[in-house]
């Protein structure tokens, strides 16, 4: 089963414009749907909500209606899943509080995984597992050479042959957002070896 898709920004079809700088996030016409306090709040936070989007997709995959993006972001911030730094920067998603929230709020078994080779991901998906994987955001561009690994989260939900199937909440087109597919070796170039495994 392919999980329902949720993007970091509410207007999934306009994420490409937001990333290209031709549309300000504050001008996303669907921002009120997010639960943000205002357009400026939405613009400040949405770029950091890849983890929230992945958690929402993981809940939806299990038939659970997910909370609005900013309702979940506020809950996770309260739990330490996001940290607001004195300089205004936002740090997160921090995995352990997210795992605790999945358990406490929904009874979902999840665990933080580190030092996990890309080759081990298919085994984690067996039997309906999901993996929120840390990758470089350049994963949306086929053939791109990432300057580093990590910094962004995607929801890996399936395997087809040697391809990993995943949703990318900051994909800039339908093809790079929903059920994106990459060979395992190609995925590994972007992958930081860590994430959250859900059963």
Please place each PLM-identified region on the residue numbering.
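Mid-length scaffold segments of soluble, non-membrane domains
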Residues: 81-114
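Residue-level signal for short, function-critical loop segments
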Residues: 56, 137, 170
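Active-site-adjacent substructure of cysteine-protease-like catalytic cores
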Residues: 113-167, 198
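Active-site-adjacent structural segments surrounding the nucleophilic cysteine of cysteine proteases
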Residues: 1-88
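Noncatalytic regulatory segments and standalone regulatory/sensor domains
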Residues: 7-39, 43, 47, 144-148, ...
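Extracytoplasmic/secreted envelope proteins and their assembly/folding machinery
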Residues: 52-56, 96-99, 118, 122, ...
